[in-house]
């Protein structure tokens, strides 16, 4: 049932020994990612924790990658008009600017942007606008070393990964080395923002 699936997703951890959910060409990537970046936290476990910890009247926004699917499956809104998800076109880069506009519309309610690292890299310039205008938005950045959802779509069709994972180039000329470790909290240094990480 849904409650059992929610508990499974909410408690999921990952390491290099976790068996893949789908056995395809991408099966070893998640374990390698956990090893290279020293992380066992899954997106679903992070979403469960965020959902429990934020104010019950907070408004969340998202739009691209695997977050819309995971949030549709897992997110438990506690008040009306608190869930804003762009499903139609998976508009990468919308999450930060959308959160700024949303915060301007909802006033005192806390606003949380759920954004993947690929989308954040594409367009996070409105973070500076939020600072300039003294508009508080909360950015929850999910790092899956690039464009994980697009990578899953590529490899799920039997293709090799085509630069959708942020990996170092090896002597072969391919981007199949270890994963890059990007300090996304460091991106906001020099801006008067508060940085937290898990």
Q: How does the language model describe each region?
A:
Residues 18-19, 42, 172, 198:
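General structural signal for secondary-structure boundaries
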Residues 3-6, 69-70, 75-198:
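Thiamine diphosphate
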Residues 21-103:
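Active-site diphosphate/adenylate-binding microenvironment
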Residues 13-36, 144-156:
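Charged, low-complexity, helix-prone segments enriched in Lys/Glu/Asp/Gln
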Residues 1-17:
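Terminal amphipathic helices with adjacent charged low-complexity linkers/tails
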Residues 18-19, 54, 170, 191:
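Intrinsic-disorder/low-complexity coil detector
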């Amino acid at each position: 049932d849904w409650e059992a699936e929610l508990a499974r997703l909410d408690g999921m951890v990952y390491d290099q020994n976790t068996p893949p959910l789908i056995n395809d060409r991408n099966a070893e990537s998640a374990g390698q990612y956990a090893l290279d970046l020293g992380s066992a936290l899954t997106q679903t476990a992070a979403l469960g924790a965020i959902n429990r910890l934020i104010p019950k009247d907070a408004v969340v926004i998202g739009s691209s990658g695997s977050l819309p699917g995971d949030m549709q499956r897992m997110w438990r809104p506690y008040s009306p008009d608190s869930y804003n998800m762009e499903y139609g076109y998976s508009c990468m880069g919308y999450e930060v600017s959308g959160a700024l506009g949303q915060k301007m519309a909802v006033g005192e309610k806390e606003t949380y942007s759920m954004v993947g690292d690929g989308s954040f890299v594409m367009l996070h310039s409105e973070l500076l606008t939020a600072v300039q205008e003294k508009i508080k938005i909360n950015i929850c950045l999910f790092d899956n070393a690039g464009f994980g959802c697009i990578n899953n779509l590529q490899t799920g069709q039997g293709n090799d990964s085509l630069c959708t994972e942020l990996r170092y180039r090896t002597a072969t000329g391919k981007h199949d080395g270890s994963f890059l470790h990007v300090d996304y909290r460091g991106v906001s240094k020099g801006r008067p923002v508060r940085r937290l990480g898990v």
